[in-house]
A protein has these predicted regions:
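Sec-dependent N-terminal signal peptides
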Residues: 4-13
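C-terminal segment of classical bacterial N-terminal signal peptides
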Residues: 14-18
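Active-/binding-site microenvironments in catalytic and ligand-binding cores
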Residues: 19-311
Length: 311
């Protein structure tokens, strides 16, 4: 993969596989649409459930609204309405009610990036799907969010801020494989096949509410070698308490978000962004049961989420 093409939103074009010598089909077979989520099964879920020790549940989502910083031009707006109640007209004889109208992008705030999010410069997506064929203005015909099964797995919080002895890393600051391995040793944990790995940098805990403009203008992030390492470990998803996972500004100005391509396009690994990791870090939680069931919007590329970590 030469460069990463960062695509946002749905793609405009009219499900086929690409006959491309440079493209390797997934280990899960031609036509697979869920990537490393195939690693989750009844046995792995039962094993992960044994991590519950205290029963404390942590919300990994954050509150979002029309002022939430987002990757341009993403935004959202919400209107609360009273259908049929115009001009003082009674809605029902026995009740009144509110409805809400959401207008916005699913790739805002705490989100999962699906396997249809990132392609290479030739629009080759995960498992050799041709982006020019699967990407319609009305939604993806392959690799849509609705294909993702329940993600119930062993979760790991890797505390990069702690190993660097800071409250938070700075925008544009990378953490490399050496940093990750130092944190794993310090926490006495190891990455295993089927895990959901989430990095704590302190960025959201210390910047999201107090300085949202700074929070959204850049972010600390992983180096490509970290993404490759986690792909070799066969994880299901990789997340962080940043809006990008990759470092912003990027290491190479003309090659943004390299980790996205390595994880999603090349290996079928999901990305979790803007994870609320502060409370887990404060409680020194390293392992937990991770639970996520994304909304099944047919053809969606990304989805706003609120995963749960149970200690």
């Amino acid at each position: 993969m030469q460069k990463i093409l960062f695509l946002f939103g749905a793609f405009i074009s009219l499900p086929v596989l690409i006959a491309n010598e440079a493209c390797e089909f997934s280990r899960w077979g031609e036509g697979d649409e869920i990537g490393n989520a195939n690693l989750i099964n009844a046995e792995s879920i039962l094993k992960a459930s044994q991590l519950i020790k205290t029963g404390k549940a942590y919300s990994l989502g954050v509150i979002i609204d029309q002022n939430t910083p987002a990757y341009p031009p993403r935004s959202l707006s919400l209107q609360v309405v009273q259908p049929t109640g115009q001009f003082g007209k009674d809605q029902f004889p026995n009740a009144t009610y509110n409805d809400d109208v959401f207008q916005g992008w699913f790739g805002i705030g705490p989100q999962i990036d699906g396997l249809g999010h990132i392609g290479d410069p030739d629009a080759v997506f995960y498992n050799c799907f041709d982006g020019k064929e699967i990407s319609q203005i009305t939604g993806l015909t392959k690799l849509g969010i609705e294909k993702i099964p329940p993600l119930v797995a062993r979760g790991l919080l890797i505390n990069i801020a702690a190993v660097k002895k800071v409250d938070h890393l700075e925008a544009g600051e990378t953490f490399n494989l050496r940093d990750v391995k130092r944190a794993l040793r310090a926490q006495n944990i190891s990455v295993e096949s089927g895990d959901v790995v989430i990095f704590h940098t302190g960025w959201t805990q210390y910047k999201y509410d107090t300085n949202p403009e700074e929070w959204g203008s850049g972010a600390p992030g992983i180096t490509p070698e970290v993404a490759s390492y986690l792909a070799e470990k066969e994880v299901v998803a990789v997340g962080a308490d940043t809006w990008s996972l990759d470092v912003v500004p990027p290491i190479k100005a003309n090659e943004p978000y390299p980790g996205h391509g390595i994880l999603i396009q090349e290996n079928g690994i999901y990305i979790l962004e803007t994870m609320n990791t502060g409370e887990l870090a404060d409680d020194n939680v390293s392992e937990f049961l991770f639970v996520l069931g994304p909304a099944k919007v047919r053809g969606a590329v990304q989805m706003i989420i609120n995963p749960i970590a149970i200690n």
